[in-house]
From Swiss-Prot:
<dbReference type="GO" id="GO:0006412">
    <property type="term" value="P:translation"/>
</dbReference>
<dbReference type="GO" id="GO:0003735">
    <property type="term" value="F:structural constituent of ribosome"/>
</dbReference>
<keyword id="KW-0687">Ribonucleoprotein</keyword>
<comment type="similarity">
    <text>Belongs to the bacterial ribosomal protein bL27 family.</text>
</comment>
<dbReference type="InterPro" id="IPR018261">
    <property type="entry name" value="Ribosomal_bL27_CS"/>
</dbReference>
<dbReference type="GO" id="GO:0022625">
    <property type="term" value="C:cytosolic large ribosomal subunit"/>
</dbReference>
<dbReference type="InterPro" id="IPR001684">
    <property type="entry name" value="Ribosomal_bL27"/>
</dbReference>
<keyword id="KW-0689">Ribosomal protein</keyword>
<protein>
    <recommendedName>
        <fullName>Large ribosomal subunit protein bL27</fullName>
    </recommendedName>
</protein>
<feature type="region of interest" description="Disordered">
    <location>
        <begin position="1"/>
        <end position="21"/>
    </location>
</feature>
<dbReference type="Pfam" id="PF01016">
    <property type="entry name" value="Ribosomal_L27"/>
</dbReference>
Length: 87
Protein backbone atom coordinates (compact mmCIF):
# COMPACT_ATOMS: atom_id res chain seq x y z
CA UNK A 1 0.00 0.00 0.00
CA UNK A 2 1.11 3.52 -0.73
CA UNK A 3 1.86 5.60 2.32
CA UNK A 4 1.59 8.99 0.54
CA UNK A 5 -1.44 10.59 -1.05
CA UNK A 6 -1.41 10.94 -4.80
CA UNK A 7 -0.57 14.42 -6.10
CA UNK A 8 -3.95 15.38 -7.55
CA UNK A 9 -5.00 18.73 -8.97
CA UNK A 10 -6.68 21.34 -6.79
CA UNK A 11 -10.08 22.90 -7.40
CA UNK A 12 -9.28 26.13 -5.55
CA UNK A 13 -7.31 29.19 -6.64
CA UNK A 14 -9.96 31.53 -8.06
CA UNK A 15 -11.36 34.80 -6.74
CA UNK A 16 -13.27 37.64 -8.37
CA UNK A 17 -11.93 41.18 -8.43
CA UNK A 18 -13.62 43.55 -5.97
CA UNK A 19 -16.23 45.86 -7.52
CA UNK A 20 -15.35 48.94 -5.40
CA UNK A 21 -18.92 49.50 -4.28
CA UNK A 22 -20.00 51.80 -1.46
CA UNK A 23 -20.42 55.42 -0.47
CA UNK A 24 -17.94 57.67 -2.28
CA UNK A 25 -19.02 61.04 -0.81
CA UNK A 26 -20.26 61.22 2.78
CA UNK A 27 -22.75 63.58 4.43
CA UNK A 28 -21.49 67.16 4.67
CA UNK A 29 -18.98 66.81 1.83
CA UNK A 30 -18.92 69.38 -0.97
CA UNK A 31 -19.60 67.93 -4.44
CA UNK A 32 -19.64 69.18 -8.01
CA UNK A 33 -22.26 68.33 -10.62
CA UNK A 34 -21.60 64.83 -11.94
CA UNK A 35 -19.68 63.60 -8.89
CA UNK A 36 -20.47 59.99 -7.96
CA UNK A 37 -22.01 59.77 -4.49
CA UNK A 38 -22.75 56.02 -4.13
CA UNK A 39 -21.92 52.90 -6.15
CA UNK A 40 -24.34 50.09 -5.33
CA UNK A 41 -26.11 46.96 -6.52
CA UNK A 42 -29.82 47.71 -6.36
CA UNK A 43 -31.09 50.74 -4.44
CA UNK A 44 -29.83 50.47 -0.86
CA UNK A 45 -29.78 54.28 -1.07
CA UNK A 46 -32.44 56.10 -3.08
CA UNK A 47 -32.00 59.37 -5.00
CA UNK A 48 -33.34 62.48 -3.27
CA UNK A 49 -33.33 66.10 -4.43
CA UNK A 50 -30.68 67.03 -6.99
CA UNK A 51 -29.41 63.43 -7.27
CA UNK A 52 -29.60 61.24 -10.38
CA UNK A 53 -29.80 57.45 -10.68
CA UNK A 54 -27.63 55.69 -13.28
CA UNK A 55 -28.55 52.46 -15.07
CA UNK A 56 -26.29 50.50 -12.70
CA UNK A 57 -28.02 52.21 -9.70
CA UNK A 58 -25.12 54.63 -9.19
CA UNK A 59 -26.18 57.86 -7.48
CA UNK A 60 -24.59 61.09 -8.76
CA UNK A 61 -24.92 64.82 -8.07
CA UNK A 62 -26.98 66.87 -10.53
CA UNK A 63 -25.59 70.18 -9.27
CA UNK A 64 -22.91 71.63 -6.99
CA UNK A 65 -23.60 71.57 -3.27
CA UNK A 66 -23.39 69.58 -0.03
CA UNK A 67 -24.29 65.89 0.38
CA UNK A 68 -27.14 65.04 2.77
CA UNK A 69 -28.18 61.54 3.89
CA UNK A 70 -31.70 61.09 5.30
CA UNK A 71 -33.93 58.24 6.46
CA UNK A 72 -37.38 58.31 4.86
CA UNK A 73 -40.54 56.31 5.37
CA UNK A 74 -40.17 52.59 6.10
CA UNK A 75 -36.47 53.08 6.91
CA UNK A 76 -35.48 53.94 3.33
CA UNK A 77 -32.25 55.87 2.91
CA UNK A 78 -32.25 58.95 0.66
CA UNK A 79 -29.24 60.88 -0.63
CA UNK A 80 -29.76 64.54 -1.55
CA UNK A 81 -27.57 67.47 -2.54
CA UNK A 82 -28.27 70.85 -0.93
CA UNK A 83 -27.41 73.53 -3.51
CA UNK A 84 -24.39 75.71 -2.79
CA UNK A 85 -25.28 79.20 -1.49
CA UNK A 86 -23.81 81.01 -4.53
CA UNK A 87 -26.02 79.07 -7.02
Amino acid sequence: MAHKKGGGSTRNGRDSASKRLGIKKFGGEHVLAGNILVRQRGTQHNPGKNVGLGKDHTLYALLEGTVLFKKGTKGKSYVSVEPAKDN
